[in-house]
Swiss-Prot record:
Protein name, UniProt field: Chorismate synthase
Annotated EC: 4.2.3.5
GO cellular component, one term: cytosol
Pfam families in alphabetical order: Chorismate_synt
Residues noted as binding FMN in the record, renumbered to the chain: 129-131, 241-242, 285, 300-304, 326
Lineage: Bacteria, Pseudomonadati, Pseudomonadota, Alphaproteobacteria, Hyphomicrobiales
């Protein structure tokens, strides 16, 4: 199996490479008669596309999406038909010549070596299939998933850049769109601008932590043991390029709490059961509680840097390498909409599976 597909009932297959003619995805399992046109998908792709500030790669890709199948116009409204939805995004600004020096060399920190060891062949141009360019297709698929989740709000924010964290007391969702970092803390965003400018000018890179919050998630999504909502969400986020860690709710921070501190106490309220806190991140026993579902993931520093690094050639000889081309000094910035998309896809899949198993018999129905 090549493992280019994820999901169970809402299934997403992505295809394409960084420097190929195009990339895209096939989404299978979306219900019929969902209003969906290219503009609905484009608005989310525009949030991820490169070249929007000096802090992201200057590769100029419009990321214009084309719907090739799976929709039909009826009564003047373009809607899904219930058949596979094929989406394509053309690559228009490849510069493969930038990678001529690494034809025989493996870039440290990249998937060059492991792809070669596994397949015996690799696309060295921008990393081929392992490039973060592949995530454009995930964002497109996430737009389809969002169309299935009108009662949910899925938002992401950058909460740490390099060693610099936000002050959670300053969290303001309205600030997220007011800076190039998707940062909810205006003071931190101003500090990050100075920090990342210094990183960028030095030809280096830094990592980041992204937080994704889904509101309006009904109780009951997910299944015990092997179909846990948090397990599948962790898997989906971990599959994003450069991600090295995932946590749900307080995550690793829960290890420092006492049982009294960590347990989210409950009480009856005017609208049902209410929680005093959300250390669990909206998931207990693998099943959603009805609270916000909260996840964070850590992105490593971009491996493409200007400093010479030691490596080996395909023939096994020691050498040095300097990575050329256009790269993100902090790939975590553009990972925010990607994380949102993966959250949306997992929730859409879990919603379909919940309905298939429970019908209208669940307590939450």
């Amino acid at each position: 199996m090549s493992h280019n597909t994820f999901g169970h009932l809402f299934r997403v297959t992505t295809w394409g490479e960084s420097h190929g003619p195009a990339l895209g995805c096939v989404v299978d399992g979306a219900p019929p008669r969902l209003p969906l046109k290219a503009e609905d998908i484009q608005q989310w792709l525009d949030r991820r596309k490169p070249g929007q500030s000096r802090f992201t790669t200057q590769r100029r890709e419009p990321d214009a999406v084309k719907i090739l199948s799976g929709t039909f116009v009826e009564d003047g409204i373009e809607m899904t038909t219930g058949t596979p939805i094929s989406l394509m995004i053309e690559n228009v600004d490849q510069r493969s010549k930038d990678y001529g020096d690494i034809v025989e060399k493996f870039r440290p920190g990249h998937a060059d070596l492991t792809y070669f060891l596994k397949y015996g062949i690799r696309d060295y141009r921008g990393g081929g299939r392992s490039s973060a360019r592949e995530t454009a297709a995930r964002v497109a698929a996430g737009a389809v998933a969002r169309a299935m989740l009108p009662e949910m709000m899925i938002r992401g924010a950058l909460v740490q850049m390099g060693p610099h964290k936000i002050d959670r007391a300053n969290w303001d969702w309205n600030e997220v769109g007011n800076n190039p970092f998707w940062c909810p803390d205006a003071k931190a965003a101003a500090e990050w601008e100075i920090y990342l400018d210094s990183v960028r000018k030095a030809g280096s890179s830094c990592g980041a932590v992204i937080e994704i919050v889904a509101s309006g998630v009904p109780a009951g999504l997910g299944s015990p043991i092997y179909g846990k909502l948090d397990a599948e969400l962790a898997s989906a986020l971990m599959s994003i390029n450069a991600v090295k860690g995932v946590e749900i709710g307080d995550g690793f921070g829960a290890a420092a709490l006492s049982g009294e501190e960590n347990a989210d106490e409950m009480q009856s309220g005017p609208h049902g059961i209410e929680f005093s806190s959300n250390h669990a991140g909206g998931v207990l026993g693998g099943i959603s509680t009805g609270q916000d579902v909260v996840a964070r993931f850590a992105v490593k520093p971009t491996s493409s840097i200007l400093s010479p690094r030691k490596t080996v050639t395909k023939g096994g000889d020691d050498t040095e390498i300097v990575t050329k081309g256009r790269h993100d000094p902090c790939v975590g910035i553009r990972a925010v909409p990607v994380g949102e998309a993966m959250m949306a896809c997992v929730l859409a899949d879990q919603l379909l599976r919940h309905r298939a198993q429970m019908g209208g018999s669940g307590r939450n129905e």
